[in-house]
């Protein structure tokens, strides 16, 4: 142990992080903070992490344990530890006895706590995964990846070593003897840094050599290229010689990576470098492996990791020690690293820049596009299997990136008619694009594939929830324009995936068997998937399941865990190195992983999973190419089995209609037709699809007459692969001209065996219903939903306070509080260029790698236990941090309550307005939380000590965190909404009375506009009460109010407004008008209260007089100033001067604050008697009677002094 301690002391270099193994999911050891004592005599103080535990033999310390004097071996518990500053090569087993000694001699090290936590984490891991799944040290962590530096040590040369699967920041100095088994890596380091290699490089500005065609695979490659790959290499070489930037657009699975490496290797043979490769995070490791396979003589450096890792790379891997010549031949990096590394990467003069998945550059306004445009490169190659994904704009973005001079103006091209447009496009693209298809070049090398669309009926629960979402969004669907229609569509997509995706909709079960049964019963897709998966496993197939939603992945994990099937998972939260580990584990020989769960975007790009032979698209992507990318993970070079692809789609839902829309996107590859953005009418058309038939099932047997039934025979037919070859041949000829002909739709036996003609007639009826255009849009929803919506609203009001809602009952859609602003609804979008999906569809490039690594990774877990029984009392608080629950309200639910409160106030204290936004809560739960909320904002701290002020600034008296809530602001907001309701009642009772007095109209500039008159204010005030404060867009678009037309006239804007900016001007106009009326209403009420006080106390005459009195704060005179300076203390003079300035500048502000808080002393008391204790607190806090003075404190805040 002493020798180890000495070695630890002389070690230098970067300190490593904790290792990234699965155990980190459960344990995050706190950094030990030394509170005294020294570690120099205790090596255990140098422990970085405990890795493992075992009962192992060791020599006994008992001298009498052996007759011949040789120590007897005894088995004791030992811990495997990693030491700070040392690599995994130097981990040691330490007996538990050594730890026990340190507990007593060095308590400040907190070793007992660390050991206890480790043991607890190990117990959990083994219980959930089994001991066989635990690996303390991966072999890669002890395998030298690269040597990046050399220095002279005490015992000879030392090398700075980067180990495989570990970041550069986890590099360690090792003596040559420590890594003597890695002589090849030592020699490679010496070769890279040799003077002969430095002198070999030439400037890449020299003239390009003439094109020389390769007839055979070049000798500098260590593998053999297919004929079409050799053709691709020659295409890239030819474009280089002609100085033409290009797109290599071969279909997925044809080896674009290998062709690109061959091209860079050919340039390297001409001493041309450096080169840059930018690739997705999920494929960067594969690029490194392919370089090692095909061009191992090239120095390839991967530029990834956090800032510390990148600093190590820049210091040791970028340049030779002499001069500024690049040491690397190829730099691999990810999209995420381009922007943070721009200061390091952009100054380099690249010979060739290759961008994998180049369609990521389709948006010229993206950060990636902007950053890469700043790089200097003599040649650019984009790799993409899908160059034309959505529209002409995106294609031109790619071409503009390649050649800004040739493709400078999209407008010029769009002026050409369709036929000439297509012809000219092909002519312009010809020198820049090479695209081959698998069916053309791999007829005999890749087994055929077959895709089936499986139409599935929704479960009864899904149908109820689906209808509830539509019904509760009746007002959204019947508006001419409402950006929130995209939210409705998203909710319907979630219902189709599984109803449990909706917030807090999942029921709570303690019994795992019952939970599993309900999980299956809730989803028609999952029921079919269960039948298929059982048979696929029996037949020895391996499966990939793709979905859009991370929550769906969790539900599928629950399913697989209950089935006790081994699986892997990748989504956007899994780090790059961990992704490759999981891919390798799945692809390993004799792997026991039956299935791979993947999000379409994170797991559908550039990875090879050809060891599977079945793909299930659980829910489709808006972009059909994303699904094709996912399929290509299996159907590619290296596949030896026939491939089956199943796409699950719920019959008569938005999913089925979406398939029709994706058809247009796919046709764009052959007929460029311009913009393909989804407009309001298209979104509405998707939602309407099948809605009439769904609601017609309520009172008859029509719903059961067309139900699709998948029995055992049907499942066997689905999984039969004997006819794959015949199907594939029939599709080949037309698959590039008609997207849907790629698929064979599976419509198996109907329960009632309806004939084909009737089925076609039904399908045609659905199509006709779904194609109702904009003129009939409103009438469609009114005819279908109006009566149901009104009945539902009436039932909801009558049952308020009695109805209990849980996961099994009808769900009420959220009142769309997303993005609520206190002042304006500017966030409401009217034009939908594309649908923003809140799922795992997010682009990985938008999230830095470091940020993803900070997120907790998902691990295999047992079936999730449900929350407490309904009869159990809900505690005031449980959990902590972001998982804190207050009376059962999580962070999101508390935020919804707060924003609803700001919008409506407390209403009549019946919480009616809170029911829909908080559909996941029962009325009783809302009521209890509402009373607690009012109690909190009514608190009036009386302890003025410094410590107490600090505490009360953070928590309420009962210990609940304040979470930044301003009580005074909320009380003012609540009372104003009460005043609005009172004003509405007054206007209803006095229809001929003026809205405001002439004095108030003059004071707050509420005069009539060019067209708007007092009668418009008379309808605007009730609109605020109806829609809530700040909901200007909803107020403007409310046809019953009809304020939009007069606002257009006031602003001289065409009606109806046809641009987003015009609609924004109208909303701003309404907001400003309401703000003026708000001030006026507060003023009127304050005048009323003061008048009553004056009458009762014979003190003061009017509010106008009170205003004058408020402004009579006298400054300190110069004589008084002189008096304060008698003791020669400058601070007194400065304080007096500061007060004078405050009087002059803040008097008006003080009066406005007085206006805000003065009238609130009685409004809550008059409104809700049952809350009298809380009401008294509210009144106390807000009262500013005649016995109070209003002053400014040192921070220029209004305070009340008794």
UniProtKB/Swiss-Prot annotation:
<dbReference type="InterPro" id="IPR009462">
    <property type="entry name" value="CHD_II_SANT-like"/>
</dbReference>
<dbReference type="GO" id="GO:0005524">
    <property type="term" value="F:ATP binding"/>
</dbReference>
<feature type="domain" description="Helicase C-terminal">
    <location>
        <begin position="528"/>
        <end position="679"/>
    </location>
</feature>
<feature type="domain" description="Chromo 1">
    <location>
        <begin position="45"/>
        <end position="109"/>
    </location>
</feature>
<dbReference type="GO" id="GO:0003677">
    <property type="term" value="F:DNA binding"/>
</dbReference>
<keyword id="KW-0347">Helicase</keyword>
<dbReference type="InterPro" id="IPR038718">
    <property type="entry name" value="SNF2-like_sf"/>
</dbReference>
<dbReference type="InterPro" id="IPR049730">
    <property type="entry name" value="SNF2/RAD54-like_C"/>
</dbReference>
<comment type="similarity">
    <text>Belongs to the SNF2/RAD54 helicase family.</text>
</comment>
<dbReference type="GO" id="GO:0004386">
    <property type="term" value="F:helicase activity"/>
</dbReference>
<feature type="domain" description="Helicase ATP-binding">
    <location>
        <begin position="237"/>
        <end position="405"/>
    </location>
</feature>
<feature type="domain" description="Chromo 2">
    <location>
        <begin position="142"/>
        <end position="201"/>
    </location>
</feature>
<dbReference type="InterPro" id="IPR016197">
    <property type="entry name" value="Chromo-like_dom_sf"/>
</dbReference>
<feature type="short sequence motif" description="DEAH box">
    <location>
        <begin position="356"/>
        <end position="359"/>
    </location>
</feature>
<keyword id="KW-0238">DNA-binding</keyword>
<protein>
    <recommendedName>
        <fullName>CHD3-type chromatin-remodeling factor CHR7</fullName>
        <ecNumber>3.6.4.-</ecNumber>
    </recommendedName>
</protein>
<dbReference type="GO" id="GO:0006338">
    <property type="term" value="P:chromatin remodeling"/>
</dbReference>
<comment type="function">
    <text>Chromatin remodeling factor that represses the expression of embryonic trait genes upon and after seed germination and thus enables the developmental switch to post-germinative growth.</text>
</comment>
<keyword id="KW-0067">ATP-binding</keyword>
<dbReference type="InterPro" id="IPR014001">
    <property type="entry name" value="Helicase_ATP-bd"/>
</dbReference>
<dbReference type="InterPro" id="IPR027417">
    <property type="entry name" value="P-loop_NTPase"/>
</dbReference>
<keyword id="KW-0378">Hydrolase</keyword>
<dbReference type="Pfam" id="PF06465">
    <property type="entry name" value="DUF1087"/>
</dbReference>
<dbReference type="InterPro" id="IPR023780">
    <property type="entry name" value="Chromo_domain"/>
</dbReference>
<dbReference type="Pfam" id="PF00176">
    <property type="entry name" value="SNF2-rel_dom"/>
</dbReference>
<dbReference type="InterPro" id="IPR000953">
    <property type="entry name" value="Chromo/chromo_shadow_dom"/>
</dbReference>
<dbReference type="Pfam" id="PF00271">
    <property type="entry name" value="Helicase_C"/>
</dbReference>
<dbReference type="GO" id="GO:0005634">
    <property type="term" value="C:nucleus"/>
</dbReference>
<dbReference type="InterPro" id="IPR001650">
    <property type="entry name" value="Helicase_C-like"/>
</dbReference>
<feature type="region of interest" description="Disordered">
    <location>
        <begin position="838"/>
        <end position="872"/>
    </location>
</feature>
<feature type="compositionally biased region" description="Basic residues">
    <location>
        <begin position="853"/>
        <end position="867"/>
    </location>
</feature>
<dbReference type="Pfam" id="PF00385">
    <property type="entry name" value="Chromo"/>
</dbReference>
<keyword id="KW-0156">Chromatin regulator</keyword>
<dbReference type="Pfam" id="PF06461">
    <property type="entry name" value="CHDII_SANT-like"/>
</dbReference>
<keyword id="KW-0677">Repeat</keyword>
<keyword id="KW-0539">Nucleus</keyword>
<feature type="binding site">
    <location>
        <begin position="250"/>
        <end position="257"/>
    </location>
    <ligand>
        <name>ATP</name>
    </ligand>
</feature>
<dbReference type="InterPro" id="IPR000330">
    <property type="entry name" value="SNF2_N"/>
</dbReference>
<keyword id="KW-0547">Nucleotide-binding</keyword>
<dbReference type="GO" id="GO:0016787">
    <property type="term" value="F:hydrolase activity"/>
</dbReference>
<dbReference type="InterPro" id="IPR009463">
    <property type="entry name" value="DUF1087"/>
</dbReference>
């Amino acid at each position: 142990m002493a020798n180890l301690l000495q070695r630890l002391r002389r070690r230098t270099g970067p300190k490593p992080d904790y290792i990234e193994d699965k155990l980190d999911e459960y344990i995050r050891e706190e950094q030990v903070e030394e509170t005294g004592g020294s570690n120099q005599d205790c090596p255990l103080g140098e422990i970085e992490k405990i890795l493992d535990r075992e009962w192992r033999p060791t020599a006994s310390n008992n001298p009498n344990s052996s007759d011949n004097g040789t120590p007897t071996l005894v088995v004791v518990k030992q811990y495997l530890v990693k030491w700070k500053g040392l690599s995994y090569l130097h981990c040691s087993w330490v007996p538990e006895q050594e730890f026990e000694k340190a507990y007593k001699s060095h308590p400040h090290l907190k070793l007992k706590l660390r050991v206890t936590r480790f043991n607890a984490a190990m117990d959990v891991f083994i219980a959930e995964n089994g001991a066989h799944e635990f690996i303390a040290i991966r072999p890669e962590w002890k395998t030298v990846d690269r040597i990046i530096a050399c220095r002279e040590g005490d015992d000879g040369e030392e090398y700075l070593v980067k180990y495989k699967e570990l970041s550069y920041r986890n590099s360690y100095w090792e003596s040559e003897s420590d890594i003597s088994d890695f002589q090849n890596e030592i020699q490679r380091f010496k070769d890279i840094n040799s003077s002969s290699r430095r002198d070999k490089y030439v400037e890449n500005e020299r003239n390009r050599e003439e094109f020389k065609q390769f007839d055979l695979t070049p000798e500098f490659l260590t593998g053999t290229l297919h004929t079409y790959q050799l053709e691709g290499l020659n295409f890239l070489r030819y474009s280089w010689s002609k100085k033409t930037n290009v797109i290599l657009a071969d279909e997925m699975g044809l080896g674009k990576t290998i062709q690109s490496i061959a091209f860079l290797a050919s340039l390297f043979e001409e001493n041309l470098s450096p080169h840059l490769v930018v690739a997705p995070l999920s494929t960067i490791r594969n690029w490194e492996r392919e370089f090692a396979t095909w061009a191992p003589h090239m120095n390839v450096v991967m530029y990834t990791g956090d800032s510390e890792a990148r600093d190590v790379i820049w210091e040791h891997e970028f340049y030779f020690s002499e001069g500024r010549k690049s040491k690397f031949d190829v730099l691999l990096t990810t999209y995420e690293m381009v922007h943070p590394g721009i200061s390091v990467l952009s100054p380099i003069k690249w010979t060739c820049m290759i961008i994998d998945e180049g369609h990521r550059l389709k948006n010229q306004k993206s950060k990636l596009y902007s950053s890469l445009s700043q790089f200097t490169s003599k040649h650019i190659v984009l790799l993409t299997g899908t160059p034309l994904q959505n529209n002409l704009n995106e294609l031109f973005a790619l071409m503009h990136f390649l050649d800004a001079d040739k493709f400078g103006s999209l407008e010029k091209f769009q002026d050409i008619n369709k036929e000439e447009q297509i012809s000219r496009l092909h002519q312009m693209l010809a020198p820049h694009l090479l695209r081959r298809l698998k069916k053309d070049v791999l007829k005999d090398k890749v087994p055929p594939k077959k895709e089936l669309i499986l139409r599935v009926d929704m479960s009864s629960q899904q149908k109820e929830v689906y209808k509830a979402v539509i019904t509760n969004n009746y007002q959204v669907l019947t508006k001419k324009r409402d950006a929130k229609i995209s939210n409705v569509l998203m909710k319907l997509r979630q219902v189709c995936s599984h109803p449990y995706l909706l917030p807090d909709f999942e029921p709570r079960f303690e019994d795992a068997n019952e939970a599993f049964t309900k999980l299956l019963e809730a989803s028609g897709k999952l029921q079919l998937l269960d039948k298929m998966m059982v048979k696929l496993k029996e037949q020895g197939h391996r499966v990939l399941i793709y979905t859009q939603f991370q929550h769906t992945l969790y539900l599928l994990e629950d399913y697989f865990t209950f089935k006790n099937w081994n699986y892997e998972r990748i989504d956007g939260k899994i780090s790059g190195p961990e992704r490759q580990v999981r891919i390798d584990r799945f692809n390993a020989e004799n792997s026991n992983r039956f299935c791979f769960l993947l999000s379409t975007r994170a797991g559908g790009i550039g990875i090879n999973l050809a060891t599977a032979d079945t793909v299930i698209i659980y829910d489709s992507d808006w972009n059909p190419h994303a699904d094709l990318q996912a399929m290509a993970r299996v159907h590619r070079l290296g596949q030896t089995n026939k491939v089956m692809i199943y796409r699950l789609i719920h019959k008569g839902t938005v999913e089925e209609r979406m398939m029709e829309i994706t058809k247009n996107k796919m046709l764009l590859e052959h007929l460029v037709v311009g913009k393909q953005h989804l407009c309001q009418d298209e979104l509405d058309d998707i939602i309407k699809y099948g809605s009439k038939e769904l609601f017609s099932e309520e009172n008859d047997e029509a719903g059961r007459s067309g139900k699709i039934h998948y029995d055992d025979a049907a499942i066997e037919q689905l999984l039969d692969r004997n006819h794959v070859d015949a199907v594939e041949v029939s599709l080949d000829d037309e698959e590039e001209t008609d997207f849907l002909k790629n698929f064979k739709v599976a419509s198996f036996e109907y329960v009632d065996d309806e004939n084909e003609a009737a089925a076609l007639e039904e399908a045609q009826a659905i199509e006709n219903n779904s194609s109702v255009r904009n003129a009939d849009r409103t009438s469609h929803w009114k005819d279908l939903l109006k009566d149901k919506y009104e009945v539902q609203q009436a039932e909801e009001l009558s049952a308020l306070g009695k109805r209990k809602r849980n996961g099994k009952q009808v769900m009420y859609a959220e009142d769309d509080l997303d993005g609520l602003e206190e002042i304006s609804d500017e966030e409401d979008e009217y034009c939908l260029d594309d649908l923003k999906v809140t799922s795992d569809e997010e682009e990985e490039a938008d999230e830095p790698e470091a940020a993803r690594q900070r997120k907790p990774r998902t691990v295999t877990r047992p079936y999730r236990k449900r929350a407490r029984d309904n009869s159990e009392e809900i505690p005031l608080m449980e959990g902590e941090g972001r998982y804190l629950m207050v009376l059962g309200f999580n962070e999101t639910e508390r935020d919804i309550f707060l924003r609803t409160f700001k919008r409506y106030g407390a209403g009549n204290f019946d919480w009616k307005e809170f029911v829909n936004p908080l559909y996941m809560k029962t009325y009783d739960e809302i009521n209890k939380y509402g009373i607690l909320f009012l109690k909190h904002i009514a608190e009036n701290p009386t302890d003025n000590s410094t410590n107490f002020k600090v505490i009360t600034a953070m928590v309420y008296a009962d210990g609940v965190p304040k979470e930044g809530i301003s009580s005074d602001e909320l009380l003012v907001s609540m009372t104003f909404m009460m005043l609005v309701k009172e004003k509405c009642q007054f206007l209803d009772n006095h229809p001929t009375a003026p809205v405001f007095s002439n004095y108030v109209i003059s004071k707050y500039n509420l005069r009539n506009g060019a067209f708007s008159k007092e009668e418009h204010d008379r309808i605007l005030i009730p609109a605020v009460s109806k829609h809530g404060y700040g909901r200007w867009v909803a107020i403007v678009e409310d046809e019953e109010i009809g304020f939009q037309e007069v606002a257009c006239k006031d602003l001289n804007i065409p009606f109806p407004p046809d641009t987003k900016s015009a609609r924004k001007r109208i909303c701003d106009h309404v907001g400003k008008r309401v703000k003026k009326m708000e001030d006026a209403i507060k003023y009127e009420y304050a005048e009323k209260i003061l008048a009553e006080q004056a009458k009762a106390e014979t003190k003061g005459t009017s509010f106008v007089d009170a205003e004058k009195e408020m402004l009579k704060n006298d400054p300190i005179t110069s004589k008084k100033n002189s008096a304060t300076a008698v003791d020669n203390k400058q601070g007194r003079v400065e304080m007096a001067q500061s007060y004078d300035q405050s009087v002059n500048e803040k008097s008006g502000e003080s009066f406005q604050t007085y206006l805000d808080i003065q009238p609130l002393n009685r409004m809550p008391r008059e409104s809700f008697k049952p809350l009298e204790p809380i009401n008294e607190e509210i009144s106390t806090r807000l009262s500013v009677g005649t016995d109070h003075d209003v002053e400014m404190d040192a921070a220029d805040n209004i305070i009340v002094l008794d």
